[in-house]
């Protein structure tokens, strides 16, 4: 399973296209048929978790030549399968900062908010189950 933190143009849309997204923590392995949880980036005025979806297209993008350190970018298209029923964003996850406690909230805080950049990340099954509780 995967999660993405990104600026979402229309949070109510039935489908989303995210071009050239940074990947970390196994995010580059995303592929068609994967479940993804969409967080509308608070850095751009979003509200955190807004949707769960199914990846309908995924394409690895060639890295830019001449850059020594870069994560492999990916473009994806996602069909919304559910709308979040409760708020889950930076303020709800911030208290979970004991990085080795194994909690799903801590995994999300670490992967999304320790570095504020938008990105696609791989998540554990436990974190996926936790996120499903928001729908």
Feature roles, as predicted:
Residues 1, 32-36, 48-50:
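Short, surface-exposed beta-edge/turn micro-motifs
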Residues 40, 59, 82:
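Residues that form ligand- and interface-recognition hot spots within folded domains
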Residues 44-46:
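Extended, low-complexity, turn-rich repeat/linker tracts enriched in Gly/Pro/Ser/Thr and Asp/Glu
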Residues 48-60:
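Short beta-strand-centered aromatic/proline hotspots
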């Amino acid at each position: 399973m995967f999660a993405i933190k990104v600026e979402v143009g229309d949070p109510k849309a039935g489908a989303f296209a995210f071009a050239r997204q940074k990947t970390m923590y196994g995010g580059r392995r995303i592929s068609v048929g994967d479940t993804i949880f969409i967080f509308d980036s608070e850095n751009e005025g979003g509200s955190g978790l807004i949707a769960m979806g199914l990846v309908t297209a995924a394409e690895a993008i060639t890295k830019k030549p001449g850059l020594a350190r870069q994560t492999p970018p990916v473009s994806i298209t996602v069909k919304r399968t559910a709308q979040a029923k409760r708020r889950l964003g930076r303020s709800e996850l911030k208290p979970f900062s004991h990085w080795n406690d194994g909690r799903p909230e801590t995994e999300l805080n670490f992967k999304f908010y320790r570095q504020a950049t938008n990105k696609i990340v791989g998540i554990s099954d436990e974190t996926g189950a936790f996120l499903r509780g928001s729908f």
